[in-house]
Amino acid sequence: MLTLDTLNVMLAVSEEGLIEEMIIALLASPQLAVFFEKFPRLKAAITDDVPRWREALRSRLKDARVPPELTEEVMCYQQSQLLSTPQFIVQLPQILDLLHRLNSPWAEQARQLVDANSTITSALHTLFLQRWRLSLIVQATTLNQQLLEEEREQLLSEVQERMTLSGQLEPILADNNTAAGRLWDMSAGQLKRGDYQLIVKYGEFLNEQPELKRLAEQLGRSREAKSIPRNDAQMEAFRTMVREPATVPEQVDGLQQSDDILRLLPPELATLGITELEYEFYRRLVEKQLLTYRLHGESWREKVIERPVVHKDYDEQPRGPFIVCVDTSGSMGGFNEQCAKAFCLALMRIALAENRRCYIMLFSTEIVRYELSGPQGIEQAIRFLSQQFRGGTDLASCFRAIMERLQSREWFDADAVVISDFIAQRLPDDVTSKVKELQRVHQHRFHAVAMSAHGKPGIMRIFDHIWRFDTGMRSRLLRRWRR
């Protein structure tokens, strides 16, 4: 069967112009105009999706099948082009009957054209084919427009669903244009309103706990840039102002022995006039033994010295992915569970904004994994937020899973975050030694988010950073009172 793409090529129908007109009409629709005004960050993300729409429409037109009636008419037209005028005159009755049987828009006009001319000349033969071709072009264009209109309605419905989802989640997950773009890409999944309302619920809870949100932001920024010393130290001139004693006659501060003739005491000067003591005077002058006034004074001068200068390079520390382990034991239920899930949502927001990955592992008696920054991130986040914390605590398995993940190439610069109340048994020695090796050799960092003030110090000592968020009633009341 003839495809629409082949028909467009045969009749020289420009499908690109039709596609561009449809996309322009879609972008100018009132629904998108209102949405762009309300969520300007998502405008760029939707605009970046236009090439994908264009390619999808091309593919749809390319694979579309031409109706059998139009296919038969096109084949008849092609055969008629090969006929000479005498042959065309012979075949004309069959051609008119075929057009009538196919209900072609050209059938009535073709019969009128033939009836209006008693003789079929070569010019009439050419005119008949030209008008027939125009009729086929109109039919092909109409078919293209019908298919594009169907695709437009379907695409508009899809975009509206994604706009609804993105509009609901944009205040929660999109902190900048990068995050808005990634959020729009994630919204392509098949989600219902009731599903993503769970994210909205925990987003509202996070806004009610600004200290928890601030804690997540501090953890996300914890890998700051640092200065790295360079070994190629060189000598450079160093200028400084120094203060030193001077002989400026500011005030007399006492007596001293020196050779300063201008500051001689009168008795010393008197010995110079005595012949017997003259040589004694010169001896004491040479030896700087004459009694003189000691004057007190200061002066500032510039002193230039050379010393080795060590330059430091500003090394921006890469901000790698998050590997977050969440304790789902029974002691982490209730308010602790809400805080842990909201904290992970805050880390997801940071990961989207900074183009990082966010990998969640739930540990109790078994390990359950979710990647919140992938193409299915929203669905994964909903599944994670739907989990119930009712298991046991197996912190050792959590660390083993983290260390296994850190050994892969794509996670070598990840930050490991463990969210727990740390009321658990001590870690095995092999786990502790392996964690310390990763910290020492590979500079991996382990963060602890402590949800209780009663966590075991022996367990928490292994972490590089401990971020405390006490969920006890007293701490909750104090935080509320401060707000």
UniProtKB/Swiss-Prot annotation:
One Gene Ontology cellular component: cytosol
Pfam families: VWA_CoxE (PF05762)
Top-level taxon of the source organism: Bacteria
Keywords, ordered alphabetically: Chaperone, Cytoplasm
InterPro entries for the chain: Uncharacterised_CoxE, Uncharacterised_ViaA, VWF_A, vWFA_dom_sf
Cystine pairs: none
Localisation: Cytoplasm
Location (main, coarse): cytoplasm
Task performed by this protein: Component of the RavA-ViaA chaperone complex, which may act on the membrane to optimize the function of some of the respiratory chains. ViaA stimulates the ATPase activity of RavA.
Record note on quaternary structure: Homodimer. Interacts with RavA.
Family the entry assigns: Belongs to the ViaA family.
Name this polypeptide is given: Regulatory protein ViaA
